[in-house]
From Swiss-Prot:
Cited InterPro entries: AB_hydrolase_1, AB_hydrolase_fold, AB_hydrolase_sf
Family to which this protein belongs: Belongs to the AB hydrolase superfamily.
PANTHER family cross-referenced by the UniProt entry: MONOACYLGLYCEROL LIPASE, SERINE HYDROLASE-LIKE PROTEIN DDB_G0286239
Enzyme class, UniProt record, top EC level: hydrolase
Organism, scientific name: Danio rerio
Residues at the active site: S118
The name this protein goes by in its record: Serine hydrolase-like protein
Gene Ontology molecular-function annotations: hydrolase activity
Residue ranges of every copy of the AB hydrolase-1 domain listed in the record: 44-155
Pfam family for this entry, one: Abhydrolase_1
Keyword line: Hydrolase
EC number(s) stated in the UniProt entry for this protein: 3.1.-.-
Stated role: Probable serine hydrolase.
């Protein structure tokens, strides 16, 4: 069983101050980092951030959720403070699913819930289909849980992803880290993420940059920007979705991701119909793609209500989990 280590840290939100422990877990290429809130025996909830974000995306939401639950929010590899994947490796989507499997094995969680934002919600969807016996409930924050691709685009994207990766590797010795002032780093982050408030940008930057001589550099691996090389089409997506046994809520922002990012014609309707067939819950809230970070009060109560055990007698000890040593 892999050990993991935690150190105490604090953060401040507009609503309250709450202690978080720093999560550290060894993996073959380095370590996974993240944050932990709540008692080790608490009801387990895994929090998965979106692409190019980090576990800080949950820093304002978790303090509004039950304080006797156990929340573990990880930085995916190549994000936040986690190690980058080894040289020459791709950031292919299934690897993120495997990362989750590593984490819950180390935590000794046999059954748990997931809150996933954007890409993290897609990871949650795939994990829940592959390991339906492990996942009790899933909250999908501004995502449909799956991102199918047109068959005609799959191989074009694969070719581009392979070529870009090889080109990146060939230029590795020529590449230098760009150093920013804090304000310039914040400006760059907000240009890439126009939904973020000033406070939200500062929160993400706690784990998104590190200080060096002369300023700050971004911690994330540039390779996360390269094309994914593994996709599923709509028919595969709907089949995989049908394997999910967890209780699912799609918590969508009125001015969220799908106002600017559109799926191919008819895909969203087909995915939503499949979720409806699975008896998923749909909730729309006022806000943008990062509403859970910018305005957590808009989503905290509905998340708490949804994740509450279905039976008052259902406790963490009945889930089959061992009390985590991590």
């Amino acid at each position: 069983m892999l050990p993991a280590f935690m150190s105490l840290r604090h953060f401040t939100t507009t609503t309250m101050r709450r202690a978080a422990s720093e999560f550290r877990m060894p993996v073959p290429w380095g370590e996974l980092r993240g944050q932990v809130w709540g008692p080790s025996h608490g009801r387990p909830v895994l929090c998965l951030h979106g692409w190019a974000d980090n576990s800080g995306t949950f820093n304002t939401l978790v303090p509004l959720l039950p304080n006797d639950w156990r929340f573990v929010a990880i930085d995916f590899p190549g994000h936040g403070l986690s190690s980058h994947r080894p040289d020459g490796c791709f950031y292919a989507f299934p690897f993120y699913v495997a990362d989750v499997r590593r984490v819950v094995e180390a935590l000794q969680w046999k059954r748990f819930s997931i809150i996933g934002h954007s890409m993290g919600g897609n990871v949650a969807g795939m994990f829940s289909a592959l390991y339906p016996e492990m996942v009790e409930s899933v909250v999908l924050l501004d995502t449909y849980g799956f991102l199918p691709t047109e068959v005609t685009d799959m191989f074009t994207n694969m070719r581009k992803g392979i070529n870009d990766q090889i080109q990146y590797d060939n230029m590795a010795n020529e590449r230098k880290e760009r150093v920013y002032t804090y304000e310039k780093a914040k400006e760059r982050l907000k240009v890439a993420n126009p939904y973020l408030s000033d406070q939200s940008a500062d929160i993400l930057l706690e784990r998104a940059v590190r200080e060096v001589d002369g300023g700050f550099v971004f911690t994330r691996d540039f390779r996360i920007n390269l094309k994914n090389i593994i996709y599923i089409n709509i028919d595969q997506c709907l089949h995989v979705l049908s394997q999910v046994k967890a209780k699912v809520m799609l918590l969508l922002a009125k001015d969220g991701l799908f106002k600017t990012f559109t799926l191919p014609d008819g895909y969203a309707d087909r995915i939503c119909k499949s979720w409806t067939d699975q008896k998923a819950t749909f909730v729309e809230v006022e806000g943008d793609h990062h509403v859970h970070l910018n305005n957590p009060e808009a989503v905290s109560s509905v998340i708490t209500d949804f994740l509450q055990p279905q039976s008052p007698d259902q406790t963490e000890s009945q889930s089959g989990n061992q009390t985590s040593r991590l």
